[in-house]
Curated annotation (Swiss-Prot):
This is Protein MoaF. InterPro entries: Calycin (IPR012674), MoaF_C (IPR035348), MoaF_N (IPR024724). It comes from the Bacteria. Disulfide bonds: none annotated. It comes from Klebsiella aerogenes (Enterobacter aerogenes). Residues 1-13 form a propeptide.
Amino acid sequence: MTSEAVFIQVGALADGFAPHGNLLATASLPAGENFTFYVAGSEPQQLVIEDEQTLSWNGKRAPWRATALRPDILFIDFLDPERDNASISAVCNLTQRNATLVYGQLPDEAPRAGRLQPGRTRVALTAVEVRFVFARLDAQPGPLPGFTDALIGMRNQYTYSPTERYEHIYLNDNFYAWQCLDGVEKGLADVDRCHYVQVAEDLYLFVWREKIIPTLGVILIDLQQMRTDGKIMGYQGSDFGALSNFPVGATAKILNVTRHQE
């Protein structure tokens, strides 16, 4: 009889991913560089790089990290200076002059998975919240990113480091299945809520929200270079006392693709 699966906290996951991870080098942005995100019907949001460690988001300061999976694609990630236990990830397409803003929020207590009960409506299957905003990087009209089903049916393998390897199966618009093949979560698997956004040709933003251990993943998947880049956010321990918001990257391999007949 096998032992019961034990899901680990995100802090332990970060420790496992850290040694020799397949991370991109950080992107250097000059002090004073600014990005204005124009959203129809809303006030523009302002991001200003103050120095190599600090940015300003609508006038409030926060530490930041940026990478460039492609020369014209910036991934800027930081903890939300206006909310506790929250982050903002900005994916900027400098060629198309548009962006996707991902606002993530962790619960402040242990989550309870939602389920159907007689006479009641369904509650959320995960306590991790996410909100997407599609914006222009200038005041001129133009194309915006959008949700996509292009990844659905793919079964991919991701190698995050010499010791950490995962498999993903993108099931439908709302869910994907994952399992850890090697690493600190080896033998663990689940089906979790997810979202897909097309950023550019063969480049996708994949966001997932785990229900057992409160976790938010925000990852770019480049099917031309066959690699990924992004971050994972959760709590360091089970006491919900400190956040772990750490970068991740992987090499990618498409194992197969399933297309169901309608």
